[in-house]
Amino acid sequence: MNGSIQGKPLLGKGMSESLTGTLDAPFPEYQTLPADPMSVLHNWLERARRVGIREPRALALATADSQGRPSTRIVVISEISDAGVVFSTHAGSQKGRELLHNPWASGVLYWRETSQQIILNGQAVRLPNAKADDAWLKRPYATHPMSSVSRQSEELQDVQAMRNAARQLAELQGPLPRPEGYCVFELRLESLEFWGNGQERLHERLRYDRSDTGWNVRRLQP
């Protein structure tokens, strides 16, 4: 897709009155339309790191149960792969159970400081246990005890008992064995949208959709 954006703002900067970002956020890809969205994702994350976005990899991930009822939570993107983004969880958690029955998921990265967001849609695939072993050992060892004793998303009946169990494991120091349910998913992307706060409320939206031959890219109206 080719094209260019012409013309000048009529009313000065004219940014959205409903967003509170204070940092300039360059969006050169809106002009050049790169063929590969993963390169755009890498560029945005690197720029976010450089300008000091506090949690650039905090992804609001939405899944749905067998009846189509959605649920959302924040997960941390640990890796950008060729096919999508990687995150860790527990297989017995609500998201783990939902992804087992319905692998389709959608996530949003929102950066308040720059008034930017990235929407990621695709199918979540559980990766081999070797990948989970590696991810577990990369976590700070201080997180191992509670992650080992917790049965994520199950009812908590005795707070102190769980705390005591985690403290006992912490006395062992060093890494603990990976819990059986600790796993890693790759959200293999079928579409991405990069959103920037444009001038005169003409927000800059760049949409990528996977096709049989690669990616289709287009600008969207605000």
Curated annotation (Swiss-Prot):
Please write the reaction equations for the catalytic activity of this protein. (1R,6R)-1,4,5,5a,6,9-hexahydrophenazine-1,6-dicarboxylate + O2 = (1R,10aS)-1,4,10,10a-tetrahydrophenazine-1,6-dicarboxylate + H2O2; (1R,10aS)-1,4,10,10a-tetrahydrophenazine-1,6-dicarboxylate + O2 = (5aS)-5,5a-dihydrophenazine-1,6-dicarboxylate + H2O2; (1R,10aS)-1,4,10,10a-tetrahydrophenazine-1-carboxylate + O2 = (10aS)-10,10a-dihydrophenazine-1-carboxylate + H2O2; (1R)-1,4,5,10-tetrahydrophenazine-1-carboxylate + O2 = (10aS)-10,10a-dihydrophenazine-1-carboxylate + H2O2
| Keyword S-adenosyl-L-methionine found | no
| Binding positions (substrate) | S18, H90, R139, S147
Entry GO MF terms: FMN binding; pyridoxamine phosphate oxidase activity
Q: Name the residues that bind FMN.
A: R73, I74, V75, V76, S88, T89, Q94, K95, Q117, Q152, S153, R205
Q: Name one Pfam family in it.
A: PNP_phzG_C
Asked whether the UniProt record includes Flavoprotein among its keywords, one would answer yes
PROSITE patterns recorded for this chain? PYRIDOX_OXIDASE
Q: Which cofactor does it need?
A: FMN
* Cross-referenced InterPro entries: Phenazine_biosynth_oxidase (IPR053451), Pyridox_Oxase (IPR000659), Pyridox_Oxase_CS (IPR019740), Pyridox_Oxase_N (IPR011576), Pyridoxamine_oxidase_dimer_C (IPR019576), Split_barrel_FMN-bd (IPR012349)
State how the cofactor is bound. Binds 1 FMN per subunit.
**Keywords for this entry?**
Antibiotic biosynthesis, Flavoprotein, FMN, Oxidoreductase, Virulence
Associated pathway = Antibiotic biosynthesis; phenazine biosynthesis
GO aspect biological process, one term: phenazine biosynthetic process
Q: What is its EC number?
A: 1.10.3.16
Q: What does this protein do?
A: Involved in the biosynthesis of the antibiotic phenazine, a nitrogen-containing heterocyclic molecule having important roles in virulence, competition and biological control. Catalyzes several oxidations in the terminal steps of core phenazine biosynthesis. It oxidizes both hexahydrophenazine-1,6-dicarboxylic acid (HHPDC) and tetrahydrophenazine-1-carboxylic acid (THPCA) and thereby contributes to the generation of both phenazine-1,6-dicarboxylic acid (PDC) and phenazine-1-carboxylic acid (PCA). It synthesizes phenazines in their reduced form, which are the likely end products in vivo.
Subunit arrangement?
Homodimer.
For this chain, the family text in UniProt reads: Belongs to the pyridoxamine 5'-phosphate oxidase family.
The protein, known as: Dihydrophenazinedicarboxylate synthase
Q: Which organism is it from?
A: Pseudomonas fluorescens
Q: Which gene encodes it?
A: phzG
